[in-house]
Amino acid sequence: MRQKVVFPGTFDPLTSGHFDLINRASILFDEVILAVAASPGKRPLFSLEERLALAKEVCQSLPNVTITGFSNLLIDFMKEQQATILLRGIRTGSDFEYESQLAAMYRRMMPEMEIIFLPPAEQYAFVSSTLVREIALHGGDAGQFVTPNVAEAIKAKQLQLAQS
């Protein structure tokens, strides 16, 4: 049986830390589904379509990674994908605490689910989409925390926001 893992997130924007986890997951699993959440309640900087396009570009060198958007309950999405393994990145103790609570809830709703927590490589342990957005929204250069295509998209978004 092929091992399939779902790595969900808003990915607004996709960071170098995310890519590190995706790349490592692509080595560990036969198939990785990067599930980009619509998350309208979070008021994302990039639209779902933009986030999907950026993720596809970032992951183009990984043939066993599929990028897809979703707006339903993660449990339902996983069932649609016939996946029972969930990958979550954890950077800090507070991430672990929050993710452990989510894991307990997910397991209650889908008992056959396995949840894997994967810490980032050390150089990405402090990188988060929230911090990258904050840098970008204040006119800073977040390029060292994202891939070149995402850095260009952030610069374009900065110009767009400055003109509005």
From Swiss-Prot:
Substrate binds at residues 10, 42, 74, 88. Keywords: ATP-binding, Coenzyme A biosynthesis, Cytoplasm, Magnesium, Nucleotide-binding, Nucleotidyltransferase, Transferase. Transmembrane segments: none annotated. InterPro entries: Cyt_trans-like, PPAT, Rossmann-like_a/b/a_fold. Its cofactor is Mg(2+). Its EC number is 2.7.7.3. One of its GO terms (biological process) is coenzyme A biosynthetic process. GO terms for molecular function: ATP binding; pantetheine-phosphate adenylyltransferase activity. ATP binds at residues 10-11, 18, 89-91, 99, 124-130. It is found in: Cytoplasm. The record marks 18 as: Transition state stabilizer. Gene3D superfamilies: HUPs. It is an enzyme of class 2 (transferase). Pathway: Cofactor biosynthesis; coenzyme A biosynthesis; CoA from (R)-pantothenate: step 4/5. It catalyses: (R)-4'-phosphopantetheine + ATP + H(+) = 3'-dephospho-CoA + diphosphate. GO terms for cellular component: cytoplasm. Homohexamer. Belongs to the bacterial CoaD family. Reversibly transfers an adenylyl group from ATP to 4'-phosphopantetheine, yielding dephospho-CoA (dPCoA) and pyrophosphate. HAMAP family: PPAT_bact. This is Phosphopantetheine adenylyltransferase.
